[in-house]
UniProtKB/Swiss-Prot annotation:
Main location: cytoplasm
Protein source organism: Nitratidesulfovibrio vulgaris (strain ATCC 29579 / DSM 644 / CCUG 34227 / NCIMB 8303 / VKM B-1760 / Hildenborough)
Keywords, in A-Z order: Cytoplasm, Exonuclease, Hydrolase, Nuclease
Function: Bidirectionally degrades single-stranded DNA into large acid-insoluble oligonucleotides, which are then degraded further into small acid-soluble oligonucleotides.
Protein name: Exodeoxyribonuclease 7 small subunit
Length: 81
C-alpha cells in the first residue's frame, strides 16, 4: 500500500510540474506569480529526481548489485509470480 501511495505522490508531482510548465510557457502571468511557480517547479523537480534516484537504488538491490541497462523484453515470460 505504501508503494502505491508513493507512486501516486510521484504522479501527482509530475502532473503539477506539467501544469506549472504550461502556465509559464503561456507567458500571460505577472512576474511575481511566474517567479513563485518557478520556485515551486524547482522544488517538485528536485523531489522527483530524489524519488527516481531512490527507486533506481532499490532496483539495483533487487538485481543483487548487478547494474545493467533496463531491457523490457528481458525475463518477461508472462509469469507474474
Amino acid at each position: 500500500m505504501a508503494g502505491r501511495k508513493k507512486a501516486a505522490d510521484f504522479e501527482q508531482q509530475l502532473a503539477r510540474l506539467q501544469e506549472i510548465v504550461d502556465a509559464l510557457e503561456g507567458g500571460d502571468l505577472p512576474l511575481e506569480k511566474s517567479v513563485a511557480l518557478y520556485k515551486e517547479g524547482l522544488g517538485l523537480a528536485r523531489a522527483s529526481r530524489e524519488q527516481l534516484a531512490k527507486a533506481r537504488n532499490e532496483i539495483r538491490l533487487f538485481t543483487e548489485g548487478e547494474v545493467r541497462d533496463f531491457d523490457p523484453e528481458e525475463g518477461d515470460d508472462g509469469d507474474d509470480r
